[in-house]
Amino acid sequence: MKMNKLFFGLLLQAAFYSGSLYAQADLRTDAYSIIQDAVTDIVCSSSTDAIQKEKRVIQVLNEKGKEDASFVCLCDRFSSLKKFSGEVRDASGNVIRKIKKSELKITEYSDGLVSDDYYYFFEYTPSRYPVTITYEWEIKNSDGLIGYPSFVPQKSYNQSVAQASYRIPV
């Protein structure tokens, strides 16, 4: 019985490994952008307070993927953007631009009647493709952590995901 479990585990590992290699080679097919890395870490300091650390590395392959180069962060009376940094690199890996928190725009537009929600956003339109954009930010949740944020690394159609992780240390 133990040998069957070991064999089954090795078989699953081999299938997963070969499948992931195939997927890596196939990421550009029909893709306008690729999420090279999406990391979400939730660090809870109490039952009502937490820090949400986010990192996104997005490679925009062509003009059809330019919407994926933008940054958007929703905040409300329970959550606020504490840290932000961004960086844009060209195809050779040279830094084209660094983005600071002070460059983000804020809008309080809401489709509802009354809302405390507001958005931080940054719109970037590349002049040449491909470009790789890295965004790193921290959101402080306080006075009411009802649940953990959802994890959806793929934000648009025709977008591939190379690597993504969601961690909640205990």
Question: Positions of the model-derived regions?
Answer:
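Positively charged n-region of N-terminal signal peptides that target proteins for export
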Residues: 1-6
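Bacterial N-terminal signal peptides
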Residues: 9-20
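Beta-strand-rich, non-transmembrane domain signature
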Residues: 23-170
